[in-house]
Amino acid sequence: MVATQIAYYDFTKEQLAERGGSATVRELLNDGTEFRELESKVNLAEEGLKRIMAAKDLELCESIAGSGSRYGDWKILDVKNTNEETGFYAVLLETDSGHAIIAFRGSESKDYNQVLKDWINADFGLLMARDTVQQKNAADYMAEINQKYSYPYYAVTGHSLGGNLAEHAAIAAPDDMRGRIYQAVSFDGPGYSGEYIERNKDLIARVAHPVVHYRWSLIGALLTQPTCAVSRVIQVTEDIRSNTDKEALYMRHGTPFIEWNGGESVVDGTEDLLAFAMGKWSLKVDETVMKKRREKE
């Protein structure tokens, strides 16, 4: 899960260039503005879930940057950022000499531009059975990494829309790379349209290792997961579990509200009624869209 959070930090190619082409996560966090921005969010957040979420984000950042953290030792080798144009952002992390992680950023709602790029063009694009620009970006980035690097083992991951992109990256990876993708994890990412599943069925069948899909909110219940994915409902923390107001239903999707067993493993949960209902609704919408498209052909 840590890699998905690192993908939300605003690291740049310029920062890497200043350090000879790569830098540890700890170096960039300590030299950048992430701490100040997260501290500001805590100070400005209203009491309640927003304050809790902001505090947990800051706590995780401090933990990653800590002197004894193995996550802080990870090297950032590359940043792919077309966030302003398409909403796409991903980082390549080296965890040791033989392993690398490609982490994809998820949906953001910090300003109108990001709402348009992520929630409308990308997330709603999935619901309406449209190919998304960000999915193409993810596939292109996998091809670029495959050309530039030769790690024996890769993992792909992301939260929310980033989880959908991570699954797509595993599905659309170059043939000589897919066998080296030993792990793919989607954290509450939405699924895919029926048209996507049909169009990519041969590639889906060739995914070398099962994709793990953790879900705990209505976002992760949307649309259809491919046959290469194993979906698992996990538990959220007590401070939001029984809260049914509108804000809680939206914020539940955040990774700070995942329940951890000893800080290492997730806990099995049960699907809430809203997620169940929205999942069924999204399938009906997808079926209607496919039917109307075929009528026009």
Predicted regions and their residues:
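Surface-exposed flexible segments
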Residues: 19, 114-117, 121, 226-237
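N-terminal low-complexity, Ser/Thr- and acidic-residue-enriched intrinsically disordered segments
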Residues: 1-59
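Gly/Ala-rich beta-loop-alpha elbow adjacent to hydrolase catalytic centers
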Residues: 157-162, 166
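Short loop/turn segments at secondary-structure transitions that flank enzyme active sites
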Residues: 106-110, 162, 190-193, 220
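Serine hydrolase/lipase
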Residues: 96-99, 143-154, 171-297
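A conserved cap/lid and substrate-binding interface adjacent to the catalytic center
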Residues: 33-36, 40-155, 175-183
